Amino acid sequence: MRRSSLAALGMVAVAALLLAGCASAEPNGPAATEPATETPQSDPDLGAAWLDGGRLIGLVTLGSSTCVPQAEEADLVDGVLEVTLAEPAADQPCTMDLVPRVTLVGVPEDVDPAKALPISVSGEDYFGEVDLAGVGGLTPGGETDYLPSAGWATAPGQFIVLTWGSSTCVPVISDVAATGPAELTVTYEAVPEDQVCTMDMVPRAAVAAVNGLAGVADVQAILTGDQFDGVAIPIYGVSA
């Protein structure tokens, strides 16, 4: 009986302390404030390039090669292209590498590719701004011609190559070299003979870089290897 009485007394003491605490609290005290949401710093590595005759823009960000963000929206607001990025599903496995990867954005028809285009990119815990130099002769909107294209990005020597084909047989760049005063060659790895390719047709974009062509206009890219046999395409813009 003694042990039970001590336990009962302990419970009464705890209840008394709780009541005392409630009585001493100020009924009109200041409400708890939520912590301020921090705005993420602008990504210094964000890049951009014109592609597909002006129908697409490739955005370059750093991150996992297997978890590339997708563009949800792209709207021209007061002369600024505002792009919203969506991250892959939380349960999607992501490699732990840190590489430049490309998010493709459809260009609104009211954008004039001949003029410099400020781009603002936002997403979950992400923000970046970049200015894309204008390129004449490009036209946004309309249907793609499914031909390869390339555009200089905003980082020095960096460019994006866009090809079309199977989503499971994406061409892999093995080498890039300047092969002339206004020419570079992109070499792709050979496709394994036993590789199975789906019959879909999707855009496939890859980031590459080359030295020695800064400031050179009208550079041609020669695509070799894989399904390409010396295909020549212009690189939109000028290398930084």
Ranges and model annotations:
Residues A86-V102, Y188-A209:
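An anionic, turn-rich surface loop/hairpin at beta-sheet edges
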Residues L17-G21:
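C-terminal motif of bacterial Sec signal peptides marking the signal peptidase cleavage site
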Residues P108-D110, S120-S167:
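Surface-exposed beta-loop interaction hotspot
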Residues D45-D75, S149-D175:
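Short, surface-exposed binding/anchoring microloops in extracellular/periplasmic proteins
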Residues A74-P88, V176-A190:
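Short, aliphatic-rich beta-strand segments
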Residues M1-G10:
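Bacterial N-terminal signal peptides that target proteins for export
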Residues E109-E129, V210-G237:
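A short amphipathic beta-strand at an alpha->beta junction
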Residues A23-E26:
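Bacterial signal peptide processing site
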